[in-house]
Amino acid sequence: MSSLMLRLLPLLYIISAHFVLHPETSPSLIYEIGSIVTFHCRLETTTNIRSVSWYNKNRLISNHEVQNMDNLSFTDDGYVLIHELNKINNLAVDSKLYFHIKHNRTTSLLKIKAKSAYDATCLTCTFTVDNEKTSATSCLKLFMKPIVVLYFRYLDNFLDVTCTVTSYPKPNVVIKFLGEVYKRDIPIVRQNENGSSTVSVNFTFKRRTKLEFVGKTVSCLASSWFTNQKASALVTSGEHTVQNHDEYSKEGVKSSNSDETVFTWTVPLILILISVIVLLISVCIVAFKS
């Protein structure tokens, strides 16, 4: 062996000794509140793994110690080494560790049920390989689809419309009526126990005649993060409540109310048709008597 190779051997040993694989994980997870969330962390090796740990900030929440892999019996798909239950802020944590010998891969799975918006958090998984530690962090984002409730009633000569929406994050709420969009700069907002917000918007519309608004479409439109929901109803002569989870396009907010246009043209045509029928019947009766 040459003198150059002899001098390079210590350097190669130092480099190889400090070369550590980095875990693979999803940096960002998006789930709906109430879902079971799965954090996963994978390392492309099954050699010399001493432990796999999960941390919530600096607090240890799950730890798998690997004592002696030689005594483990592996299946073709992998072997579940430890099944562990723990707590994160009173949340049940279901943690499992898999060794996939065929693929030379170690995977750690950690499951929680996200009950509220406050369960959104970042978890860090740490693999200890020999005496080296290598980590990766995954952050959870939560959302709640808007629950939309539309209510209207008459107060003397006014149509009173209230739109109430519950979602997370806090929704933007508008009322659409007679082709116009109405919103409040400062709506009524209530915070709920699960971290969601309930936003209420109210408007009154003066009617010139008793039946002016009957048959017109009134809609409650809500947008929260990437989700749009609405509730719509035809105005009646009394009070009415409707709850809906239909999705809508934001373009619909800008467009005219097609339902009202159809109603505006349909009613006069029906009245004209009825008048013609009555006139024909009258002519027939007169002709028959004569």
UniProtKB/Swiss-Prot annotation:
Q: List the disulfide bonds.
A: 41-125
Q: Name one GO cellular component term.
A: membrane
Segments spanning the bilayer are: 268-288
Q: Where is this gene product found?
A: Membrane
Q: Where is the Ig-like V-type domain?
A: 23-135
**Protein keywords:** Disulfide bond, Glycoprotein, Immunoglobulin domain, Membrane, Signal, Transmembrane, Transmembrane helix
Cytoplasmic membrane side: 289-290
Please report the record's description of how this protein sits within the membrane: Single-pass membrane protein
Q: Which residues form the signal peptide?
A: 1-17
Chain positions carrying an annotated carbohydrate: 71, 104, 194, 202
Q: Which residues lie on this side of the membrane: Extracellular?
A: 18-267
Q: MF terms per GO, please?
A: cell-cell adhesion mediator activity
Q: Which InterPro entries match?
A: Ig-like_dom (IPR007110), Ig-like_dom_sf (IPR036179), Ig-like_fold (IPR013783), OX2G-like (IPR047164)
**Residues in domain Ig-like C2-type?**
146-236
PANTHER family with a match to the protein in the record? OX-2 MEMBRANE GLYCOPROTEIN
Name the UniProt record assigns to this protein: Putative OX-2 membrane glycoprotein homolog
